[in-house]
Amino acid sequence: MGTVCESVATAKSSTAVMSSIPPFLSKTYDMVDDPLTDDVVSWSSGNNSFVVWNVPEFAKQFLPKYFKHNNFSSFVRQLNTYGFRKVDPDRWEFANEGFLRGQKQILKSIVRRKPAQVQPPQQPQVQHSSVGACVEVGKFGLEEEVERLQRDKNVLMQELVRLRQQQQVTEHHLQNVGQKVHVMEQRQQQMMSFLAKAVQSPGFLNQFSQQSNEANQHISESNKKRRLPVEDQMNSGSHGVNGLSRQIVRYQSSMNDATNTMLQQIQQMSNAPSHESLSSNNGSFLLGDVPNSNISDNGSSSNGSPEVTLADVSSIPAGFYPAMKYHEPCETNQVMETNLPFSQGDLLPPTQGAAASGSSSSDLVGCETDNGECLDPIMAVLDGALELEADTLNELLPEVQDSFWEQFIGESPVIGETDELISGSVENELILEQLELQSTLSNVWSKNQQMNHLTEQMGLLTSDALRK
């Protein structure tokens, strides 16, 4: 009987204790102590505080179930009124000295605070000490949240500025790409229109292929290497007569065959045995050296032969006679200065002194007729009185294929290539020499009538001398 009474008294006392605990604290304790809610809200490791792990889920599911609302800020303000404080600033962890795990009966020690103006001036000492040790949960939580929001705002502003800069750069690149695409489209349209017109034109393909061939030909001609004349060949070509061999050097022009035949016949006559006594005959004239004893100061021979002056010899055109050397000036050879391709220094007068005994009879050129009169060799050749042979002078005269003539006629430039040839001073000099030589030769052949006239005058002079 007594035991039953004690149990009833204990139940009454527990009921009285439970009735003295505020409903907010009781519901909060039951919610935290429930093991089914540990993933959202649970006790801390020290069992003297609780932690809200998932605030959105906590506000969505548990606040409506226990407190009939879903406002987490309102729940925090309720905790603040009962003296709870936020322990960790990085998470939602709240603590109170009377809120411990397994000690629900001490929740009655937690008293809800009233506003300061309403509170009596005197309060218990224990409550004062507990309030001084705690931190206002609502105030601390709001300030922390404001600071966090400000930090987030700054970060977002920086990110926004960066994104705007990237947007401007991207727009600039996009404009450039659009302009390039527009230009490419215009070029493509121009090309298509050009091709359409070209296909419609019947002579386009022929003209295009012709231009391509001309361009290739021009490139090949510009890359062609031209041979420069050898210095030794230039030196050998500059001398008209070799003093030792007395070989005759001449330029072979377009009338090469006729001139070669005439010179060979003259050489034949000079080598004939019938000309050994020409030194004493009348009307002989010189191509080489003759004895000085046969020639006087006035140009006549010692045995009364007719006068043959240097003017008569030098007036013969260079197109029919080879280059000869002389060392005395002549006053009547001005006509030859403008027509001969060689200088006056290429003529040679008769030698004097002891050279008479050493001179060969082959150096004299003359002829004898049946009546004893001396006939002019040139007139005889032109009149057909003498027969010429064309085998004597082949070794003495250079051929067209010789290197001396290749520098003049081997590679004659085309008129269209004049601009390409004038690329250096050496080439310019060679071209000018070739052009001058060609013009001189053309002038020589244009003076054929004058040469014939001079030849006739020489024949008349010879006849007059014989009459005297």
From Swiss-Prot:
It holds the Pfam family HSF_DNA-bind. The hydrophobic-rich region (HR-A/B) corresponds to the oligomerization domain. AHA motif is a transcriptional activator element. Residues 211-220 have a biased composition (Polar residues). The keyword Cytoplasm applies. It comes from Arabidopsis thaliana. This is Heat stress transcription factor A-1e. Belongs to the HSF family. Class A subfamily. Residues 133-199 are annotated as: Hydrophobic repeat HR-A/B. Homotrimer. Exhibits temperature-dependent phosphorylation. Residues 277-305 have a biased composition (Low complexity).
